[in-house]
Structure formats: structure tokens, C-alpha cells
Amino acid sequence: MTVTGIVAEFNPFHNGHKYLLEQAQGIKVIAMSGNFMQRGEPAIVDKWTRSQMALENGADLVIELPFLVSVQSADYFASGAVSILARLGVDNLCFGTEEMLDYARIGDIYVNKKEEMEAFLKKQSDSLSYPQKMQAMWQEFAGITFSGQTPNHILGLAYTKAASQNGIRLNPIQRQGAGYHSSEKTEIFASATSLRKHQSDRFFVEKGMPNSDLFLNSPQVVWQDYFSLLKYQIMTHSDLTQIYQVNEEIANRIKSQIRYVETVDELVDKVATKRYTKARIRRLLTYILINAVESPIPNAIHVLGFTQKGQQHLKSVKKSVDIVTRIGSQTWDSLTQRADSVYQMGNANIAEQTWGRIPFYQPVSQSDL
């Protein structure tokens, strides 16, 4: 049977995600971000809730991406997630895209010209942002022209690179409805951005999500809920360059601005430059918030939930993969668990995220109904 992998954040889970799951074939394995997102922000609802949303709408198995895979630039995010999916026996990678490119051809180009492409990337000016460098590389070697600020393009190409290195087939699906960052109230296929922005509009949320009651009744957070803690971390840390990926230039910029801003968004605006994108600054602020340092990625894979079909698939791979279904006296990934503890500080109603939690079980897969 085909085992299809999907890399996701589900922040929150919406009708577009449900459509993607409906298009995927076979056993559907989701590698999902935990409580902090790829672009450096807290999830609007916790990872257990988002996992349940996915399992109730077509997913068979949801595993958690470690913190230092989740909160990364597109290439590292995709590479880490796809390598985990490959270990779980995934042979097909499904992802949404706003423009259907010949991803198979692009993957072949990368396999055949990987060293040249990576060398080209390293030669690009440091004045360019990472997305701009990637755009130049793909334009040079694959003839692709696109906006370097379009996240789905950047992620789609990152998935292509990662899948080609793991021998995984690609299954791109045309994105339905609103664009990735659209905040418009497109009711049937609203974007996650729009649903977060208009979360207080119950009618809109109910139209845009298949799990609206679960979402609306769950404790929610935004970046600003952590601003006081972030400010404390910045002002009391003796050397911010000890934090993961924070260099002296960024440390000085953050330190000099934190006294004069009242929101996370203001701080991001003050610190970001053409070279350091807002997404990168948000990631760095997330690392500071968590007090993250460079750490090895855990070998074990943490399971958030499964259906009966997903549980059977886990049994078929457990001899070759170290699976964690309950975190107790032994840690899984100390950095991810620290991130979970910080995440809980954003809302007193957020349930325990780590200790003793067991996977959510959805008895019947939607595809079996």
C-alpha cells in the first residue's frame, strides 16, 4: 500500500488541509510542527488539538517535528521533516502549491547538479536574504521565475530537494482558495493566516474549518502573549550570541531596540533588514524566548496520534525506528520539552503538553467511512 507523507503545521487545520488529505492516497502520515511554527511564532492552539483535528479529517498518523526542525528556514525545515518521514516508510510526498511546476524535473536537476547548485548558492552576496538567494539559484539552474517571498513556492522547492535525496515520489496538489498569506475572508477555503486574524468571527471560522468547535473551545495564544517573557530574556541575558543562530550584529540590534518597543511586531520591524527577513528575526526571537542552543536532533520519533490504520503502520516500522508514545521519567527532546513549558505560559488554560500525555486515538479513518 502507498504510504503518503505530508509535512504540515495545521495552524490551524482548515478546509484546504482537509482537501489535501482527501487527495492523498494510502496511509497518510503527517510530520507536524509542535507548539512553535516554521516562521517563528507560537501555534494558535496546541499540538495535541491540531493533531486531533487532522486525525478526525483523514490523517492516519501524526508525529511531532522536534523544535529545531520545526523552527527553521525552509530548506532545513523540509530536509528534517522529510528525512523523518522517510524513516517511517513514506514513499510518496504530498504537498500544496499555488502554481503547478514540473517538480519531478526540478528534482532530477537537483540530483544531477547538486554540488554546482550549492556552490552557486554560497557565492551569492551576503546582502541578499536566504529566499532571494534560493530564487537566484532556481532561476539559474531550472529556469524558474517566481517571487522569493511566496512561502509555498519556497517550501515546494525545498520539499523537492529533500524528497529527491530520499528517493520519495512527489505529489503536488493545486492549492484551493485563498493564497498562503491571504487575510481575506474567503469562507470555504480560507487561509490559516485569515483564520488566525479573524478568529473572533465565529461564523467565518465555522465556514472555513471542519473542526470549528474544537478550535473555538481550545485555549488560544498569539506572539504578544509572550512579549513580557521575551523582553525579560533579552534584557537579562548576558550574551545573546550564545543563543542558537544569533550573531553579534543581530544581538546588538535586538538589545538596542527592546527598551523602545511595546509589541513583538514592533521589535521585528525595528530589527529586520533586507538581509535579515522578518521571518528570520521571528525565528531568532523564538530561540531567545526558549533560550535555545544548538542541540542534536533526537533519533526517536514522538507520536501525537493515530487511527487504527496508522497504529498498524507504526507496528510495521517499530523494529527499525525508535518510537516514543509517552514521555515520562526519560526525556524525548529536552529542547522541545522546554519549548512546550514556555508555550504553556502564554495561556493558563493550556493543558500539560509533555509529561504523561499519550497519543490521541481516532478509531476509524475518514477514508474508511
Swiss-Prot record:
GO molecular function terms listed in the Swiss-Prot or TrEMBL record: ATP binding; ligase activity, forming carbon-nitrogen bonds; tRNA binding
GO CC annotations on file: cytoplasm
InterPro entries: Rossmann-like_a/b/a_fold, tRNA(Met)_cyd_acetate_ligase
Binding sites annotated in the UniProt record for ATP: 7-20, 96, 152, 175
Signal peptide: none
Compartment(s): Cytoplasm
One Pfam family per UniProt: HIGH_NTase1
Catalytic activity: cytidine(34) in elongator tRNA(Met) + acetate + ATP = N(4)-acetylcytidine(34) in elongator tRNA(Met) + AMP + diphosphate
Role, per record: Catalyzes the formation of N(4)-acetylcytidine (ac(4)C) at the wobble position of elongator tRNA(Met), using acetate and ATP as substrates. First activates an acetate ion to form acetyladenylate (Ac-AMP) and then transfers the acetyl group to tRNA to form ac(4)C34.
NCBIfam families linked: PRK13670.1
Similarity comment: family membership: Belongs to the TmcAL family.
Protein name, as recorded: tRNA(Met) cytidine acetate ligase
Source organism: Streptococcus agalactiae serotype V (strain ATCC BAA-611 / 2603 V/R)
